[in-house]
């Protein structure tokens, strides 16, 4: 029963199911292991039992493993792994501090160089999203991959059956940030920026627009809450034109459908009348709430901006002139929040909620990588990206962040890698049978992973010629595994070695499965916004 629960919890992640083990664990390379949280007591029934993880690592990698915990929400006694534990915590479904990624990679790098047998075992709670973010960054740091998208796709294929590895847009974005810093030899320095305006375009659906709220945090510290600040909020909405088809045919019978259209026409006229009264400083019974009908809750006239009458609603001011005269750009609809001048630096989280504080969407950006006009599409917004049927947000929905003039020189300092750093990168060969190689972004990518047993005495042997190799061919839209093995049930992604050892002291074999119709190819974070930084 416990095994069934573990399989259910791990979902589409690859598991180690051999030699008496059943662990949510997969080899990404010879020396990088991804796994779920090592748990105790009741949680150990449906997650990785701590004792089983300890036994596994002692059996196959005794004295040569270091565990990295990425969970901010839970810890364990480091003595359970002989004190060899690295702790780089950040919240689930969130991005880490950008500096933390580099610190993590340097830690893993130092550990690997102590002994060629050493491995890094990396986990968060589920062992997929946060774990994947850090592993993908490491794959670029050590030179195995140069391209962000390829690194993400490689990890997804080796960690999951459905090729859905890192799926949170903000986490993908941060892999892209780090990849760029590696490729461009950027020494990261947080840049101070001034946020002036946030625009949602087109308008979100199924929500009272007057109830849209948001907060801005630097790291975990909230620095701006729309409920507590006065600001101008401008809503631009299309003017609807209703044609009464009954007037074209006097003999046409009055149907329920036609009757509703007549009512819509009357409501439209009443709405415009209400707005006209509002602009004259009068209150109207129709001005109940700002919603799809284009009305706003009754409030005081607080003046004009650019000829537009402003209305006070809570702590914010709304301009509705566009609603009254249809004076929009084409079919443009948006809601704009004029923040003023908010100074920010580093890792920024912006979260939009409704009046009940239910999350609409959120996203992370880093100020050192943004442009003066940063556009984040729906696919780059956490939670909103799941709205595949566009019920809550239009397909072309996006967020626009307008910053004050940016100091490009302050953005980052470009440095040339020292001879020592160049030597360090050469420690990890660019082409071998346990790493993926790519000659260009669009070329096919071939990854060779043997099903031979892994042994802690040979887990860095890069000259294997085992006859039972499984070949992973990765194209831009599809990843597939092919091998002489045919049993897909116990497939594991364990890279190759040549030494033949008994199963008692060997890690799982790779048994290949063909994976088709990849629908989880990650978007390169450098293009996660409509404008590259």
Swiss-Prot record:
CDD domains in the cross-refs: PTP_PTEN
Gene: pteN
Function comment: Dual-specificity protein phosphatase, dephosphorylating tyrosine-, serine- and threonine-phosphorylated proteins. Also functions as a lipid phosphatase, removing the phosphate in the D3 position of the inositol ring of PtdIns(3,4,5)P3/phosphatidylinositol 3,4,5-trisphosphate, PtdIns(3,4)P2/phosphatidylinositol 3,4-diphosphate and PtdIns3P/phosphatidylinositol 3-phosphate with a preference for PtdIns(3,4,5)P3.
Catalytic activity: a 1,2-diacyl-sn-glycero-3-phospho-(1D-myo-inositol-3,4,5-trisphosphate) + H2O = a 1,2-diacyl-sn-glycero-3-phospho-(1D-myo-inositol-4,5-bisphosphate) + phosphate; O-phospho-L-seryl-[protein] + H2O = L-seryl-[protein] + phosphate; O-phospho-L-threonyl-[protein] + H2O = L-threonyl-[protein] + phosphate; O-phospho-L-tyrosyl-[protein] + H2O = L-tyrosyl-[protein] + phosphate
Start-end of Polar residues biased regions: 410-439, 479-505
GO molecular function, one term: phosphatidylinositol-3,4,5-trisphosphate 3-phosphatase activity
Keyword terms of this UniProt record: Cell cycle, Cell membrane, Chemotaxis, Cytoplasm, Hydrolase, Lipid metabolism, Lipid-binding, Membrane, Protein phosphatase
Enzyme Commission designation: 3.1.3.16, 3.1.3.48, 3.1.3.67, 3.1.3.-
UniProt superkingdom: Eukaryota
UniProt domain Phosphatase tensin-type: residue ranges: 14-185
InterPro entries per the UniProt record, alphabetical: C2_domain_sf (IPR035892), Dual-spec_lipid-protein_phosph (IPR051281), Prot-tyrosine_phosphatase-like (IPR029021), PTP_PTEN (IPR045101), Tensin_C2-dom (IPR014020), Tensin_phosphatase (IPR029023), Tyr_Pase_AS (IPR016130), Tyr_Pase_dom (IPR000387)
Low complexity composition bias: residue spans: 265-298, 455-478, 517-533
Name of the protein described by the UniProt record: Phosphatidylinositol 3,4,5-trisphosphate 3-phosphatase and dual-specificity protein phosphatase PTEN
Region named Disordered: 235-298, 410-533
UniProt cross-references to Pfam families, sorted A to Z: PTEN_C2, Tc-R-P
GO biological process, one term: protein localization to uropod
Entry-linked SUPFAM superfamilies: (Phosphotyrosine protein) phosphatases II, C2 domain (Calcium/lipid-binding domain, CaLB)
Enzyme class: hydrolase
GO cellular component: cell cortex of cell tip; cell projection; cell trailing edge; cell trailing edge membrane; cleavage furrow; cytosol; equatorial cell cortex; nucleus
Keyword Hydrolase carried by entry: yes
Membrane-spanning ranges: none
Gene3D superfamilies referenced in this protein's UniProt entry, alphabetically: 2.60.40.1110, Protein tyrosine phosphatase superfamily
Topology with respect to the bilayer: Peripheral membrane protein
Keyword hit for Cytoplasm: yes
Reported consequences of knocking out the gene: Growth defect. Failure to aggregate. Slower migration. Leads to increased F-actin polymerization. Unable to suppress lateral pseudopod formation and turning. Having a direct on PI(3,4,5)P3/PI(3,4)P2 levels. Significant increase in chemoattractant-mediated activation of pkbA and a decrease in chemotaxis speed.
Cellular localisation: Cell membrane; Cytoplasm; Cytoplasm, Cell cortex
Active site per the UniProt annotation: 124 (phosphocysteine intermediate)
């Amino acid at each position: 029963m416990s095994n069934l629960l573990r399989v259910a919890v791990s979902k589409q992640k690859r598991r180690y199911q051999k030699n008496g083990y059943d662990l949510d664990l997969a080899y990404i390379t010879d020396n990088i292991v991804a796994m779920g949280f090592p748990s105790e007591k009741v949680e150990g029934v449906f997650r990785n039992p701590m004792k089983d993880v300890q036994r596994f690592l002692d059996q196959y990698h005794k004295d040569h493993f270091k565990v990295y915990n990425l969970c901010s929400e839970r810890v364990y006694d480091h003595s359970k792994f002989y004190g060899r534990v690295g702790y780089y915590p950040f919240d689930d479904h969130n991005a880490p501090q950008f500096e933390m990624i580099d610190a993590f990679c340097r830690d893993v790098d130092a550990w690997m160089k102590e002994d060629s047998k050493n491995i890094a075992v990396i986990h968060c709670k589920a062992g997929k999203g946060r774990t994947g973010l850090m592993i993908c960054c490491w794959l670029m740091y050590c030179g195995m991959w140069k391209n962000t998208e390829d690194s993400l796709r490689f990890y997804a294929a080796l960690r999951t059956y459905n090729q859905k590895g890192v799926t949170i847009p903000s986490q993908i974005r941060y892999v892209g940030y780090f990849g760029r810093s590696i490729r461009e030899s950027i020494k990261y320095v947080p840049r101070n920026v001034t946020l002036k305006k946030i625009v949602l375009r087109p308008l979100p659906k199924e929500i009272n627009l007057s109830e849209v709220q948001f907060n801005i945090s630097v790291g975990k510290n909230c620095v701006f809450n729309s409920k507590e600040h006065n600001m101008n909020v401008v809503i631009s909405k299309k003017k609807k034109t209703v044609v009464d088809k009954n007037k074209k045919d006097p003999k046409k019978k009055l149907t329920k459908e036609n009757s509703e259209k007549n009512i819509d026409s009357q409501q439209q006229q009443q709405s415009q009348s209400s707005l006209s009264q509002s602009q004259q400083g009068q209150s109207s019974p129709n001005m109940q709430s700002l919603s799809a009908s284009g009305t706003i809750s009754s409030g005081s006239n607080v003046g004009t901006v650019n000829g537009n009458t402003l209305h006070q609603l809570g702590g914010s001011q709304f301009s509705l002139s566009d609603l009254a005269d249809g004076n929009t750009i084409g079919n443009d609809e948006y809601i704009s929040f004029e923040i003023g001048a908010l100074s920010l630096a580093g890792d920024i989280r912006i979260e939009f909620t409704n009046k009940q504080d239910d999350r609409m969407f959120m996203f992370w950006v880093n100020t050192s990588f943004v442009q003066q006009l940063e556009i984040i599409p729906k696919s780059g917004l956490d939670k909103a990206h799941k709205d595949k049927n566009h019920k809550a947000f239009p397909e072309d929905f996006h967020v626009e962040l307008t910053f004050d003039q940016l100091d490009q020189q302050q953005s980052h300092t470009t440095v040339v890698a020292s001879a020592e750093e160049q030597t360090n990168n050469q420690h990890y060969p660019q082409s071998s049978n346990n790493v993926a190689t790519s000659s260009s972004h669009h070329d096919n990518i071939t990854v060779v992973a043997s099903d031979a047993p892994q042994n802690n005495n040979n887990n860095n042997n890069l000259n294997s010629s085992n006859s039972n190799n499984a070949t992973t061919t990765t194209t831009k839209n599809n990843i597939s595994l092919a091998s002489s093995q045919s049993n897909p049930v116990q497939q594991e992604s364990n890279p190759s070695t040549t030494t033949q050892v008994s199963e008692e002291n060997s890690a799982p074999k790779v048994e290949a499965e063909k994976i088709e119709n990849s629908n989880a190819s990650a978007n390169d974070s450098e293009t996660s916004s409509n404008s590259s930084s």
